[in-house]
């Protein structure tokens, strides 16, 4: 579903991503794990088409900046992406119109799951940051994307929302979506990942699969800590 080939990104003369290649298949959860400043958010913004880069990125076989690719993609950034003067309900209606999809009640069910149903008439500017983040998640999922990218998804969420989000990860995987989750919090990715790419200084320092033989030899936490302290 998602393929990156030799993606490199500079900010001026500063190298942010160095020759990154990987793929995320349908029904797979991939993790980008690394300390702050490792280049995780930069590579995600490249995938989402927000930054220019060298190399090649495709989504469902389409170039990542094409309309076809964008219809398959959901990008939920670390900083909530909401409009101050739209209500919660109007946010979902805006997304439905943008993607030309009918209201089948899925958006309302997402609001119920994330405890926003009673806030449907509140403006975006009147929501707490945690509520804005939950709304951003609902908006990202309402068009049923095939590739879902989360950047630090647990930040600002309450315990109930974190539980629901983890359940949602598993549900989306079971339904065949590809998920890419960026985080620096190793405990937030336990139990549900298929492959983890550890980023250090803009490049992949290691890749570990969620297989008993690999985890028996060395836990993900031990591998991560050994690499970031080099």
Where are these regions (language model features)?
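Catalytic Walker B motif of ABC-type/P-loop ATPase nucleotide-binding domains
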Residues: 148-152
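Helix-to-loop junction immediately C-terminal to a conserved catalytic motif
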Residues: 48
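Conserved ABC transporter NBD signature motif
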Residues: 55-69
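Conserved small/polar residues in nucleotide/adenosyl-binding loops
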Residues: 228-230
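Conserved ABC ATPase "signature" region
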Residues: 93, 104-119
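Conserved ABC ATPase signature
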Residues: 123-130
């Amino acid at each position: 579903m998602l393929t990156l080939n030799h993606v490199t990104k500079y900010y001026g003369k500063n190298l942010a991503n160095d020759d990154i290649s990987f793929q995320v298949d349908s029904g797979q959860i991939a993790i980008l794990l690394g300390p702050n400043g490792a280049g995780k958010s930069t590579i995600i913004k490249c995938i989402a088409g927000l930054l220019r880069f060298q190399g090649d990125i495709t989504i469902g076989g389409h170039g990542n900046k094409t309309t076809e690719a964008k219809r398959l993609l959901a990008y939920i950034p670390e900083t909530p992406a909401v409009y101050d003067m739209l209500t919660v309900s109007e946010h979902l209606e805006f997304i439905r119109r943008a993607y030309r999809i009918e209201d089948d009640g899925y958006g309302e069910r997402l609001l119920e799951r994330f405890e926003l149903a009673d806030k449907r008439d509140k403006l975006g500017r009147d929501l707490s940051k945690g509520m804005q983040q939950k709304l951003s998640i609902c908006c990202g999922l309402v068009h049923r994307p095939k590739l879902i990218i989360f950047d630090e998804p647990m930040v600002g969420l309450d315990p109930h929302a974190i539980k629901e989000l983890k359940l949602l990860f598993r549900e989306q995987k079971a339904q065949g979506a590809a998920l890419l989750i960026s985080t620096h919090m190793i405990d937030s990715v336990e139990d549900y990942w298929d492959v983890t790419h550890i980023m250090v200084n803009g490049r992949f320092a290691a890749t570990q699969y969620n297989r008993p033989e690999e985890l028996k030899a060395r836990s993900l936490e031990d591998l991560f800590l050994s690499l970031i302290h080099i």
